[in-house]
Amino acid sequence: MKIIKKYKLWILKNIDSKYLEILNSKYIYLTKIPNNKHAVISDLFPLRIENNWNTFFELLNVPRLINPVQKINNEVEICFFDYNGKLLNVYEKVMLDQIKNTLNLKEIAKKLDITKDGTFAVFHKNDSQKLSSSGSFISDRGYVGYQNINHGPIKGYVHGNFDAVSKKDKLSLLGVSSFFKKHYIIQYEFSPEYKYELFWVNTSNTNKTITLVNLSSSNDKFSINIKPGGVKSYLFKPKDISKLKLISNLNMARPVIFRYMNGSFDVFHG
């Protein structure tokens, strides 16, 4: 059984899901497994710092949560990327006895001369021998808070989406795609009362096109192109109650959705 398990793990690490899918449609997965057993993983979170937006991150002392008895200094790297997926700069932080720390990413980005929207990733550098020996990884898909004074004083929070990128000696995107077009219907009905902004991050290592189809009324279509590691958004104001279908080669093109109301906003996954 151990040999079979090791063989399956080798396949998952070294053979792209799209090739396995040709053999059997059941053999698909959403993210890759890092080749380096000491790698750490993060989501690629949308960073909003333009037009009075601010982004906050609830940073947890993950090594301390794994081993609460031992006092461990949690060394963290926050990587900032532009909207095309280019690495701009890295911010390092050490958590001592804190369990949680709220980071103001707009302030941090300003110190790094970053003024434009993009994405960010959070890597906990502490290597856990117990985790790596069992084939597990430290991953951060924690909570991100967004705030805009034009939409009221309250932050809107949303959790991470995917194991998007890994880091050890280098950064590696973990998203997978398919030879076949995938149809994903957003699990939400869009109301004509509100405006919406949908954000997608391309976690794969190839350019991707996502086509939006309005399933209600006119069947209108709109396509966006996203570079590897990049992020794109789409503003949507429906004329009536609407459902959106997404067509792409990504195994799951799940967006982060902002709903803009009069004096407030909400943020959630689609």
What is the role of each PLM region?
Residues 1-270:
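Gly/Pro-rich, tryptophan- and cysteine-flecked surface segments typical
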